[in-house]
Design a protein with these regions (language model features):
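Conserved HGGG/HGGXW glycine-rich cap/lid loop of the alpha/beta-hydrolase fold
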Residues: 59-60, 64-115
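Active-site loop/oxyanion-hole signature of alpha/beta-hydrolase fold enzymes
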Residues: 104-148, 152
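Catalytic active-site module of serine/aspartate enzymes centered on a nucleophile-bearing elbow/loop
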Residues: 310-350
């Protein structure tokens, strides 16, 4: 038997080496299927432009698919309102290795999509119908459609679920409370009190004069608010995808819906509140909260108790961009939730 030992050892080592090269949980066949692009020629690297109908005419919406999984398709709704899909790019370092198909989507007025430059179109009900038209064009349905909304995207995702949850398999609300008045209250009663009193007084003075274009306003907010509650890195070390997305912010869209102040909401979302309707969301739903967020993590935890099949993910080191500043907690929890729902779980312990 000894004369066959070198060949046997070589076979074992070769097999082990090949096995180690595969991403977690994926065989070579599964990986090939995930990476395969069967779209029509000429192929565009997963990009699909979708023409939507609106009360003001037809417009083009930009989407990009990464990967291929007929059972798990995650559509990403960016925040702002008015940011772009780009700050979600960190997910490419985690989700493809788990076989999760992810779909970027720039909402109307954002990024690579058309910008009608018409403030009358920045209304929540119209955005809900836009998401539904995008879903139809991408052929997503209740067997595979997971919807993740972050910040403003969370408002949009909740509204979509309340009207169209029959099309969903799973819902993820990331870093967004279910009430804008409660969000404003948290900002005033909790976050504002964490400021240096002199800094806060100067910010209040600028806001009272509605002098939001004053460079001093952002100079005060960046180190005292953004670096503590939006993304917990020194501002000069913020991740490039975050800077790129914020650099393309549609200010008209942002101010119309959010308002010019960073403390609470003063635009047409001011009175938005869906606390009483959360119980009507019956699909598996995950809420994600973070300790240092602009959103109250206790409210996010409460939301999970209101959904019929709710789960909660807490990011103890995270802020509003917890997918960056508490990245492993965020990504591992998100993946565990999606895979749990795919396996038939209604709520997932995280």
């Amino acid at each position: 038997m000894t004369k066959h030992y070198p060949k046997l050892l070589l076979l074992i080592l070769t097999t082990a080496f090949c096995a180690c090269k595969q991403p977690s949980g994926q065989s070579s066949t599964a990986l090939a299927d995930y990476l395969k692009d069967s779209s029509a020629i000429p192929r565009t690297g997963g990009i699909q432009m979708i023409k939507i109908n609106t009360p003001k005419g037809k417009f083009n919406i930009w989407t990009k698919k990464i990967g291929n999984n007929p059972k798990i398709k995650l559509l990403l709704l960016n925040g702002g309102p008015g940011c772009t899909h780009e700050y979600f790019e960190c997910m490419e370092s985690f989700l493809p290795a788990e076989g999760i198909e992810m779909i970027y989507y720039d909402q109307l007025g954002c990024g690579n999509s058309d910008n009608p430059k018409d403030t009358s179109m920045w209304e929540l009900p119209r955005f809900v119908e836009e998401v539904e038209q995008v879903r139809q064009a991408l052929k997503l349905d209740s067997t595979n459609f997971y919807l993740l909304g972050h910040s403003w995207g969370g408002i949009l995702a909740m509204e979509y679920a309340l009207k169209y949850q029959k099309n969903l398999k799973g819902l993820i609300i990331s870093n967004m409370m279910s009430s804008c008045p409660d969000y404003g209250k948290y900002g005033e009663e909790v976050l504002a009190k964490q400021f240096d009193p002199k800094v806060l007084a100067r910010i209040r003075e600028i806001e009272a004069k509605k002098d939001f274009d004053n460079p001093e306003y952002m100079q005060l907010l960046m180190p005292n608010f953004y670096a503590k509650h939006i993304c917990r890195f020194p501002v000069d070390q913020w991740p490039e995808p975050v800077n790129r997305s914020l650099g393309k912010l549609n200010h008209s869209l942002y101010v119309t819906m959010q308002g010019p102040s960073e403390f609470g909401i003063g635009g047409n979302l001011t009175n938005w509140d869906r606390k009483a309707q959360l119980k009507n969301i019956t699909v598996p739903a995950l809420s994600i909260g973070a300790q240092y967020d602009t959103m109250d993590p206790k409210h996010m935890q409460w939301m999970a108790t209101q959904f019929k099949n709710g789960s909660y993910l807490y990011c103890p080191n995270g802020s509003h961009m917890a997918m960056y500043d508490d990245q492993l907690m965020y990504m591992n929890g998100l993946i565990k939730f999606i895979k749990g729902v795919d396996a038939g779980e209604k709520s997932v312990k995280l």
